[in-house]
Amino acid sequence: MTQFAFVFPGQGSQTVGMLADMAASYPIVEETFAEASAALGYDLWALTQQGPAEELNKTWQTQPALLTASVALYRVWQQQGGKAPAMMAGHSLGEYSALVCAGVIDFADAVRLVEMRGKFMQEAVPEGTGAMAAIIGLDDASIAKACEEAAEGQVVSPVNFNSPGQVVIAGHKEAVERAGAACKAAGAKRALPLPVSVPSHCALMKPAADKLAVELAKITFNAPTVPVVNNVDVKCETNGDAIRDALVRQLYNPVQWTKSVEYMAAQGVEHLYEVGPGKVLTGLTKRIVDTLTASALNEPSAMAAALEL
């Protein structure tokens, strides 16, 4: 049996109509969304299926929607007799999905928690003052140097190490623009502004992290049933306080996705299953470790094929 891990996507993977085919095949998908809707006080399934997209893309609605989609797919896997993965990891918000699936956090608690996380993130930075950009085709050290030089008293830093040659930067809008230009001058192929309202994982998120810490302290954390590799330290914590602390720091520190995938491969993982909408993490995998294979579990045919292995 191939050693496999489950990886859970973050914001950007949501689309109106996501998981419709899975819901038609597996009733547990809509049942999971009904649980989330009860926790939130509005119909989350209707939002994901009917939109409008600008509502689904509001971070405090995106986050519960993606978490619920991932948990629903994991429940399908479990219900159909799928084996437990060797490890789990989630990209940013996806870390919460991993922690729910590993039994660390109660699902309803997590749904409410990530809604608050979205609101705290939005409140931390006034609309229009923060930005993010993807830097393509430049090494990590050059990007860090460009950010340092472009800051000029403002905040800008690398925040998502997605794969070698694909790093996202975030901070104050003007500083991100200056850093993007500096990266291109240093040899980056592209500096692409991202359509987001919140500059995640940079120092501007510290006020949001302080509020999040208060909410995390109210929630029970259990020991994980499957090791979860965290974003911020690339470690598998088992202690509830250590997991909480990593989630707080995650909000204003970079997502170490490249190192997380390398770590899982070093532990003997050979295949990654992406448990959530889209195929963002599947696409990054080969660029990080070329011996790893990856596939997404968000279509009935893909789920059925994986369950047969």
From Swiss-Prot:
GO biological process, one term: fatty acid biosynthetic process
EC number assigned by the record: 2.3.1.39
Gene Ontology annotations for the cellular component aspect, listed alphabetically: cytosol
Reaction catalysed by this enzyme: holo-[ACP] + malonyl-CoA = malonyl-[ACP] + CoA
GO molecular function (one): [acyl-carrier-protein] S-malonyltransferase activity
Source organism, top-level taxon: Bacteria
Keyword presence, Lipid metabolism: yes
Pathway: Lipid metabolism; fatty acid biosynthesis
Active-site residues annotated for this sequence: S92, H201
Entry's family note: Belongs to the FabD family.
Protein name, as recorded: Malonyl CoA-acyl carrier protein transacylase
Organism this protein belongs to: Escherichia coli (strain K12)
Lineage, highest ranks first: Bacteria, Pseudomonadati, Pseudomonadota, Gammaproteobacteria, Enterobacterales
